[in-house]
Amino acid sequence: MPTTQQLLRKGRTTLQKKSKVPALKGSPFRRGVCTVVKTTTPKKPNSALRKIARVRLSSGFEVTAYIPGEGHNLQEHSVVLIRGGRVKDLPGVRYHIVRGSLDTQGVKDRNKSRSKYGTKKPKAGAAAAGAKKK
């Protein structure tokens, strides 16, 4: 416990909050170039082949980012947009790739939660035709 004199001399220091997404440097998004695109397996007890990409950012960092949604068109040298947000069952993956921006296409044939996956609104005729098919 410090004395009153010590507090007058030095004062209390407030703890600085550590950023969960340091590579973004305070920005909501960052542009980057894919260096590696691959799949990896999640931690126990989950089982899958999760799609990830190693991305060199405009801020100079090289990070691992998750590719959300079913299917993607990314390959080496694709230019992508990165946002924060970790993947709970993939250690070390703290960023998400934004679907539907720059070189990343939106998820094909997606009708719900489209804005999260960069999918355009289907045409009224196409939606009716899709409903008739089923």
Curated annotation (Swiss-Prot):
Biased composition (Basic residues): 9-20, 113-123
Any Gene Ontology CC annotation: small ribosomal subunit
Cleavable signal peptide: none
Compositional bias (Low complexity): 124-134
Magnesium listed as a keyword: no
Modified residues (3-methylthioaspartic acid): D89
Keywords in alphabetical order: Methylation, Ribonucleoprotein, Ribosomal protein, RNA-binding, rRNA-binding, tRNA-binding
BP GO annotations: translation
Matches recorded under Pfam families: Ribosom_S12_S23
InterPro entries (alphabetical): NA-bd_OB-fold, Ribosomal_uS12, Ribosomal_uS12_bac
GO molecular function: rRNA binding; structural constituent of ribosome; tRNA binding
Region (Disordered): 1-26, 103-134
PROSITE patterns: RIBOSOMAL_S12 (PS00055)
Ranges in a coiled coil: none
SUPFAM superfamilies, per database record: Nucleic acid-binding proteins
Role summary: With S4 and S5 plays an important role in translational accuracy. Interacts with and stabilizes bases of the 16S rRNA that are involved in tRNA selection in the A site and with the mRNA backbone. Located at the interface of the 30S and 50S subunits, it traverses the body of the 30S subunit contacting proteins on the other side and probably holding the rRNA structure together. The combined cluster of proteins S8, S12 and S17 appears to hold together the shoulder and platform of the 30S subunit.
NCBIfam families registered for this protein in UniProt: rpsL_bact
Subunit structure: Part of the 30S ribosomal subunit. Contacts proteins S8 and S17. May interact with IF1 in the 30S initiation complex.
Similarity remark: Belongs to the universal ribosomal protein uS12 family.
This protein's name: Small ribosomal subunit protein uS12
